[in-house]
Design a protein with these regions (language model features):
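ATP-dependent adenylation/pyrophosphate-handling site
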Residues: 1-18
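Metal-dependent de-N-acetylase/amidase catalytic core
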Residues: 34, 40, 49-192
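Active-site loop/turn elements of alpha/beta-hydrolase fold enzymes
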Residues: 2-4, 45-48, 114
Length: 192
């Protein structure tokens, strides 16, 4: 996690509720990750909604360190078409940190969509070109993981609702001829 995702929702950056909500959001993230079987993660708590005020090199270094330590072959990042500026910055910094040099293991980079963020960029839409078929157990696991984010969970027709998640999975499934799917945009694929 690059940004803390909480402070930008407050008018006063010194509001004492920020710390309380930040702790709750971090706990939500941990519970969500654990429900998916993820046990290795980092929280960097850079200021939410203000990544444009952080030197890009600092964010690049965070990501380069993670890539060096983890040595992934596949990296997933936010979409460059996202309405959220922090997400677009993370996308750019990911591409910088994942440059194809001899000490990097990355073969593929994908961007993903985030409900209530990616689909609202009407002038520059997310264009998926890679689809991953899901079954009902995958969808249930995804919804369960999201259920821990009580600060993000909304009622339908908001996209960040349980029905919103299911609707997107069914729509992406229709696009590729299956019941359920997730959609990604392949940014880079090295077969070397």
């Amino acid at each position: 996690f690059i940004a803390e995702g909480t402070s930008c929702r407050f008018d006063d950056p010194n509001d004492p509720l920020i710390e309380k909500q930040l702790k709750a959001r971090t706990l939500s993230g941990i519970k969500s990750l654990k429900s998916l079987g993820v046990d290795s993660y980092d929280f960097h708590d850079l200021p939410c909604g203000r990544l444009d005020q952080i030197p890009q090199i600092a964010i690049n270094k965070i990501m380069e360190t993670a890539i060096f330590d983890f040595e992934p072959e596949i990296v997933f990042t936010h979409s460059s078409t996202d309405t959220n500026m922090d997400h677009r910055i993370v996308n750019l910094c990911t591409l910088v940190a994942a440059r194809p040099t001899t000490n990097k293991s990355i073969k593929k980079i994908y961007s993903y969509e985030i409900l209530s963020s990616t689909e609202w960029r009407f002038d520059r839409v997310f264009r998926p070109n890679y689809f991953l078929s899901l079954d009902e157990s995958h969808l249930s696991a995804k919804i369960k993981a999201f259920s821990f984010y009580t600060s993000e969970l909304q009622e339908y027709p908001h996209p960040r609702s349980f029905l919103g998640i299911e609707t997107l999975a069914r729509y992406r499934g229709m696009q590729c001829g299956t019941d359920l799917a997730e959609a990604y945009s392949l940014i880079r694929d090295f077969e070397i």
